Amino acid sequence: LKYFIKSFLLFFIPITTLLANQKPYIVNFTRDRYHAANKNWSIGEDEKGVMYFGNDIGMLESDGMEWKLYTTPYSTLIRAVAVESHQTIYTGGSGELGRWDRDNTGRLVYTSLTSLLHDKQSLDSQSFWRIWIDGNNVYFQTFSHIYIYDHRTIRKLSLPNGFLLLQKVRNEFWVQEMFGSLYQLKNGILHKAQ
């Protein structure tokens, strides 16, 4: 028994010491390195490991070594990012929603989707906080509305008191009405939770 205890301690103590010294590899990138504003709102990653960040002055793209800043024509801040693929990224910010597609040189080119809205003036005071991709639908969420983009049109969902943040839980989309009930968003339709 003494031999077993000594052997166990001789084996266990060095391993716990090694494990205790392991620190996660974290790199802090300052704004001097990525050449944009200091506030980043959201993060997305594509299938190639390229990261995208919603920033106060545009969208940042980083492969871990290089940084690229993309701005919208109106230089709007970008609060929400959703990555469909390396070729297509959706963003939303203050009064603006759109998509970025890669051109033949690999650069991202912005297309505003606001022209698809019937009531563009309602966007003036709104900010997009969440974007989710669900098959052929893209959900853009403000506190007032959820906009559903189907690659051709945009339609708007509303509730009397507006929305809290739209969340994805186990491949289902859920949102709470501000000061109200919980709803499931399924196939572009809000269903009140029972």
Where are the model-predicted features located?
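Carboxylate-rich, polar loop motifs that coordinate divalent cations or form catalytic acidic clusters
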Residues: L1-Q194
